[in-house]
Each structure stands twice: as C-alpha cells, then as structure tokens.
C-alpha cells in the first residue's frame, strides 16, 4: 500500500511538472504577455494593502492587485540583480505564476476523477490532458489568431480574471472530490488549515466574475446539508457549527459584492455602467445576445465532443443496473448543473450591470465555460468506468484533438491591447523602458520617450501616464539612481521602425 502511495505521489509530481513546464513555455516562449497599458503599469508598481478597501476603485479585488504587485516586485528585483531586462523578467515571472495556477487547476480535476469516478491512473491523466486541450480547441475556428480560454485583453486581466477563475474552479473541484467533507478549523493541523484560510480569503476577495462559481457551489452545498440536517433532526446550533466555514465564505462573498458596488473602474476612470446607461432589462438582453454569439463562435469539433459527452452520459445511465451507481452519477452531474445555473445567471447579471460586452470575453465567462467542459470530461469518465475498453481510444482522441487545434500559422491570438505578436510587444516595451534607463544613466533628469501611435484620443495604450510610475519603480530598485521625469511622444516613425500598422487617417 505504501509502495502504491509513493508511486502515485511520484506520478502526481511528474504530471504536475509536465503541465507546469508546458504552460510556462507557452506563456514565455510562444505567447509572452508583457505589460503595456496604463492598467498594467499601475497594478504592476502598486503596493496594495491585502484587505478590502471600501470606496477604492477596486474595493474587494484584493487578490489580483496583491499578486500583480508581487509579480512586478519580483521582476524589479530580478532586473536589479542583472538577471535580464525588466520586461523579460516580468514576462518570466508572470509565466511562472500563471503556469502554477493552471497546474493546480489541472491537478484538482485529477483528484476529482480518481476519487469520485475511481478512474485508473492512465484514464485520469488522459482525461485531464483532454480537459486542457479543450481550453485551446474551444474557439479554434480560424487558421490563425484564435481566442482560447487563457486569452485576455492585457496583462492586467490575467490577474483580474484568469487567475481568480482558475483558483475558484480548482477549489470547487477539490471540494467536489470530497463531497462529504466539511472544512473545520480545529487547530489540529495548523499548516493545512491556515493555508485553507489563506486560499479561501484570496478566492473570495478576488473578482466577482471568478468568485461567483465558488459562492454558487458553497450555496448549493449549504442548502444540501441543511436539508439533510432537517431530515435527520440535527439541531440548528449544531448545523451552524458544522457549516461555519461555508457560511463564513458566503457572508464574506456577499460583503465583497457589496463593497465592489461602491468602487469605480480600474485605471481610475469612472464610467457609467451599462445598467445605468441603457437600463437593466436592455443590459440583460444585450448580455445574453453577446453570450450566445460567443457560443456560436465555438469550434465545430468542440460542439461534437459536447454532443458525444451528452450521449455518453445517457448511455451510461441507461446501461447501469446498479441503483447506487445511477444515483451517484445523477448526483454528481446534476450537482454541477445545480451550481452552474446560479453562477451563469449571476455572470449575465454582472455583465448587464458592468458592460454587456463582457459576456463575449473568455476570461470573464471562464467559470461558466469551464463548468461545461467539466461536465464533458466527467461524462467521458463515467463512460470509461462503465465500459473500460473505451479508455483504449483516449490516446487517439488526444492526438486527434491536438491535430485539430494546432495549425502551421500563429494559431492563437496574443494578449495585448494592440494585438501585436507577443515577441514584438516585448520588443516595443523593452525599447520604451530601456530608453528611460539609458537617459538616467546619461544623467538626464527629463526624457521624452517615443511610443507607438495608436490613433486613440489619449494614444491608449501608451498614454501620458505610463512613463513616470515605471521611472519611480526603477528608482526604488536601484535600476536608475535618480528621479527622472518621463514624457510620452507618440511617433509614426516608431511604428515604422517596429512594423506596427499606422492608424487610419480617418
């Protein structure tokens, strides 16, 4: 038994290292994500208190701003230690952090498959790989520059949307793997319990687009436990004691939602929300329309796999003679639907209030789309458990999905506001920041830095607010040795030099 446990742990470690390495290469070599716009800069150099702040621009989005600043500070330290240029270090640190989140997300599904579906090692690992492949296949409808589940508008959105969604989805899958386990803070396992508190704290105070799935799951779990307690005659005080952690998560999440309504938009630019501009009913109509448009842009193979999963679940349910296994399958898949529906409804409402266009962004709808893919994978897991020989087809399916996802062109879009190739975006930002460093080394106290001409009124994403915060940040880490004032000059010549398309004259 101990030998099997040791083998499983080594297998887990190897699998996690493989996923981490693959994602690290993807986000540092293939599709790097450098900072570019004002939001990226602000939250990279920001020093946010790790508590909710009523009235701030982002009152309850504590986790994104803490992690974004951590990424920036580590990158600044690496630059000061001469390990590389600042943008290169920032891309590397971000790649490591994002790869860690995705690895934890994949590992959570692995635990769920093995504990709830008794999946064999080979089948479980194959299904997790398929799950990750689906994140890249889902919007692969063109030969190049396709969206995918980890794509974002800019670097800032990785911290604000993708990471919170990954963390909350991972937590839900971990809790699903142990449906009868209720977390209790007894103090008997201080390290494990303190880590649970920290992770839940970060998850709740992250972003409503991500944390809603955790709140929906906890709500459904609490209702289920309440009905059981009523059926068994458990006292109300005992119920409250048993559910203390779940109820605290719900309470804190509601506080986060209320606090968020008191804040402004990121970047310090207050804007009218959609519900106030067009009315809530119209905002809802637009959000639903945008969401269905996004569904319509999914790849044909993805839809066929979804249909195959539905047929697989139906076949397993009809073929299963054991009433207990039927009930377990019904409870598992039905349970996902139970918390997916309130999560989806809340996301649509949130989009209607903030901006209906968010309903078409993969990073904002991540938890909803992830739930659909989770249902698909669990249906296939049930099929393999009921008909073991179908598992022999999993390697063929993995190779086929990969071949239908990858193209000989630049398959996926890069995450930056100018839609530049990631390597070109890095070169652009390196030139901008190295210009500041060169001027400081020459003893200048003022410098005018050329940036790409975008055609926007403020020249977004390179407006007048991106230079001075970075210069102050460089001074903090000794990358420059004195204060320097940075002025931004949009330049057509810069565009030509880096082969960036010039904006239309109109």
Predicted regions, residues:
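Intrinsically disordered, polar/acidic, low-complexity terminal segments
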Residues: 2-66, 75, 79-127, 388-506
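Membrane-interface helix-boundary motifs at transmembrane edges
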Residues: 4-8, 109-124, 179-189, 226-241, ...
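Alpha-helical transmembrane segments
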Residues: 10-27, 126-133, 195-198, 245-253, ...
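Transmembrane catalytic cores of multi-pass membrane glycosyltransferases
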Residues: 25-96, 208-363
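Transmembrane alpha-helical segments
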Residues: 101-113, 167-180, 215-224, 310-314, ...
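Membrane-interface micro-motifs in multi-pass membrane enzymes
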Residues: 123-178, 348-379
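Signature aromatic-anchored transmembrane alpha helix within multi-pass, membrane-resident enzymes
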Residues: 188-193, 250-251, 324, 328-340, ...
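Membrane-interface alpha helices of multi-pass inner-membrane proteins
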Residues: 190-217
């Amino acid at each position: 038994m101990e030998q099997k446990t040791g083998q499983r742990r080594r297998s887990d470690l190897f699998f996690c290292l493989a996923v981490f390495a693959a994602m690290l290469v993807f986000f540092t070599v293939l599709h790097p994500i450098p900072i570019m716009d004002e939001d990226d800069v602000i939250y990279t150099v920001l020093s946010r208190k790790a508590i909710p702040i009523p009235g701030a621009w982002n009152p309850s989005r504590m986790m994104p701003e803490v992690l974004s600043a951590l990424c920036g500070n580590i990158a600044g330290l690496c630059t000061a230690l001469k390990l590389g240029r600042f943008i290169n270090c920032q891309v590397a640190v971000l790649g490591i952090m994002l790869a860690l989140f995705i690895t934890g997300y994949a590992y959570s599904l692995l635990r769920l498959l093995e504990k709830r579906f008794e999946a064999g090692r080979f089948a479980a690992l194959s299904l997790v790989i398929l799950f990750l492949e689906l994140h890249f296949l889902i919007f692969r409808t063109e030969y190049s520059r396709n969206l995918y589940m980890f794509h974002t508008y800019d670097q800032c959105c990785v911290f604000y949307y993708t990471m919170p969604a990954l963390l909350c989805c991972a937590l839900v899958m971990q809790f699903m793997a142990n449906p009868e386990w209720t977390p209790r803070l007894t103090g008997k396992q201080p390290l494990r319990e303190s880590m649970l508190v920290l992770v839940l704290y970060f998850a709740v105070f992250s972003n409503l687009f991500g944390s809603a799935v955790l709140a929906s799951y906890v709500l459904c779990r609490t209702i289920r436990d309440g009905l059981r307690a009523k059926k068994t005659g458990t006292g109300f005080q005992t119920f409250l004691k048993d559910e203390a952690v779940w109820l605290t998560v719900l309470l804190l999440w509601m506080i986060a939602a209320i606090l968020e309504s008191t804040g402004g938009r990121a970047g310090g630019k207050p804007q009218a929300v959609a519900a106030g501009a067009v009315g809530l009913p119209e905002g809802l109509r637009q959000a639903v329309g945008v969401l269905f448009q996004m569904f319509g842009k999914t790849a044909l193979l993805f839809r066929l796999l979804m249909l195959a999963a539905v047929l697989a679940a139906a076949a397993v349910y009809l073929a299963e003679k054991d009433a207990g296994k039927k009930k377990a399958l019904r409870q598992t898949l039905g349970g996902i639907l139970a918390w997916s529906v309130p999560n989806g409804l809340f996301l649509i409402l949130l989009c209607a209030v903030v901006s209906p266009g968010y309903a078409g962004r993969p990073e904002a709808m991540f938890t909803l789309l992830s739930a659909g893919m989770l249902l698909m994978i669990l249906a296939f897991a049930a099929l393999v458990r009921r008909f073991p020989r179908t598992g022999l087809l999993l390697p063929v399916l993995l190779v086929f999905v990969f071949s239908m996802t990858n193209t000989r062109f630049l398959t996926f879009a890069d995450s930056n506001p100018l839609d530049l190739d990631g390597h070109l975006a890095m070169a652009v930002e390196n030139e901008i920041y190295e210009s500041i460093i060169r001027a400081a080394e020459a003893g200048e106290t003022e410098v005018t830095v050329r940036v790409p001409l975008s055609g926007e009124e403020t020249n977004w994403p390179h407006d007048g607010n991106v230079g001075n915060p970075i210069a102050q940040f460089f001074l903090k880490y000794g990358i420059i040795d004195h204060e320097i004032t940075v002025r931004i000059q949009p330049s057509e010549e810069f565009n030509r030099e880096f082969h960036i398309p010039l904006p239309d004259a109109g």
